[in-house]
Design a protein with these regions (language model features):
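An N-terminal hydrophobic leader/cap segment in hydrolases
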Residues: 2-54
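The serine-hydrolase catalytic nucleophile loop
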Residues: 84-97, 110
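Alpha/beta-hydrolase active-site loop
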Residues: 121-142
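Hydrolase active-site cap/lid region
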Residues: 161-217, 226
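Short beta-strand/loop motif that positions the catalytic acidic residue
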Residues: 230-232, 237-239, 243
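Conserved alpha/beta-hydrolase "acid-adjacent" motif
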Residues: 244-250
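Catalytic histidine-centered segment of alpha/beta-hydrolase-like enzymes
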Residues: 270-284
């Protein structure tokens, strides 16, 4: 009986972990707050509106766009993308900052997050093509604008992967991205399961096989490092040295893949996606220099 239980557990655990990763349960979704959007627009001296597109596979994706009073003169636009389990709400502080500096700022709910449909989160496999649809939308509001991107964690990794096909980005800022989804999973499984790190590899192998057989997803193709290796778009990598969710070594690997077109800023004392909290002024100055150079 013990042996049967172990076998069942060995089969069930990768399936459970895969389903949890691919589906953000309704109770875990962060719902956008229109009142907060109104507040941010007022503080930034901007107008705002609902944004909506359909993805290539028919998913209804939602967001907000903030248009500053100077947007016609500035000709600058930025797409802001949150991390896993968050929503556009988590990027509103950045929207305010960019709107105050004359950028049209688009904050979106990534597929499977907030109120965007999905139905599944794929960590870049499908999301990278969503970025092209969002770029089309934003540039339809601001024809000829210079387009930029800023993402956090999963959002950072999606933006890097989007550079495979989306050539209109002038530059991108990516905080705490993963080099590959396999590497990200390897770091998280011991924390999620309490199992020793040595168990991560076989669990990931089984989980990735399940994702391929059940949904047709090749999660090994989620590889920001390969996208960065190929791109000519400048990418500023930011990583907190106290990050306990995504090891700073992942950003180092990304930078090493294409040092000619990337720069790495490591922030002492900053935890996961907390660089703008620990070093706010320097964060803002570096990002603006990166976009405007």
């Amino acid at each position: 009986m013990i042996g049967i239980g172990l076998v069942c557990g060995a089969v069930a655990l990768p399936i459970l972990l895969t389903e949890r990763a691919l589906h953000i349960a309704p109770e875990r979704r962060v719902t956008p707050d229109r009142a907060k959007a109104e507040e941010i627009a007022g503080l930034a001296g901007a107008s705002w509106r609902e944004a909506a597109i359909s993805s290539a596979d028919g998913a209804a994706l939602k967001g907000w766009v903030f248009l500053p009073a100077s947007e016609r003169e500035s000709g600058k636009a930025v797409i802001l993308l949150h991390g896993a389990g968050d929503s556009r709400k988590g990027m509103l502080g950045f929207a305010r900052f960019f709107a105050q500096h004359g950028y049209a700022a688009l904050v979106v709910d990534s597929r499977g997050h907030g109120v965007s449909a999905g139905p599944r989160v794929t960590y870049g496999l499908l999301e990278k093509t969503d970025m092209t649809r969002w770029a089309d939308y934003l540039l339809s509001l601001k024809p000829g604008a210079r387009l930029y991107g800023l993402g956090m964690s999963m959002g950072a990794s999606i933006l890097i992967q989007a550079l495979d096909n989306e050539k209109r980005f002038r530059s991108v800022v990516a905080e705490c991205p993963y080099a590959t989804f396999r590497a990200a999973a390897s770091e998280r499984i011991p924390r999620l399961t309490g199992l020793p790190a040595a168990f991560a590899s076989p669990i990931i192998g089984a989980a990735f096989l399940y994702a391929r057989l059940r949904y047709g997803y090749d999660l090994d193709a989620v590889s920001p490092v390969e996208s960065l290796r190929r791109t000519h778009t400048p990418v500023l990598l930011i990583h907190g040295l106290a990050d306990d969710r995504t090891d700073p070594g992942q950003s180092r690997e990304l930078h090493a893949a294409n040092p000619a077109n990337s720069e790495l800023w490591e922030v002492p004392g900053a935890k996961h996606v907390q660089a703008s909290v620990v070093a706010q002024r320097e964060f803002e100055e570096r990002v603006m220099r990166w976009f405007e150079k």
